[in-house]
Amino acid sequence: MASMFKSLVGGIHNCNLSLLRTVLPMRLQTTIGNEINLHGVGLHRGEYASVTLKPAAPGTGIRFVRVRDGQHDAYVRASYDCVTDTMLCTTLDNHAPNGARAQVRTVEHLMAAIHVCGIDNLDVVLPQEEVPIMDGSATLFVEAIHRAGTVHLNAVARQWVVKQLIEIKDGARYAALQPHPYFALDFTIVYDNPVIGTQSVQVDEFDNLEELVMPARTFGLMRDVEMMRTH
């Protein structure tokens, strides 16, 4: 799954992309207005977990800060080329040598919230590897970011336009990005379990993501729990 994800997102970088301000209106980069502190449980370890979101300067991007012994020990970029695993959660790795290496896990709901809220620059401070799972969805992250507010920075944000079809297949799984005049999402899951079964969602406006997608919760099977807590 990690290779499929990296192939799809990497394809965005490798295809003919342009920064088209004639198509996408120029906008300023953003960060949050106030520091955010959240805590809960890590999904995989079942242990207490906390996260602090801090405003960041233009050009920082989304950066995870791993804290060990009270020190900011290592940085992990939220970038497709840092994805090392997508089995049951998304894992990012900074690929640094020796003691500077760090990983962060279960970042997907937080990253979705950051994107939906339009935040470009953020330091995400973690004293443990896992982001707290909160209520199993992205909603509590979205609400916290809204409360903190958005600050516009004195730098122009990069906005990319997909210029050609990108398709990735992995067995029965399929994902594609294709040129379109506006944001649209069409997603279907077919799961061999009567509780989940087949479910679909279609979103034709970016602003509808918060209502239609952010409340979607992680689900799991009991047979996976022990494996999750030992990996």
Where on the chain are the PLM-derived regions?
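C-terminal regulatory domains involved in ligand/effector binding and gene-expression control
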Residues: 2-120, 125-231
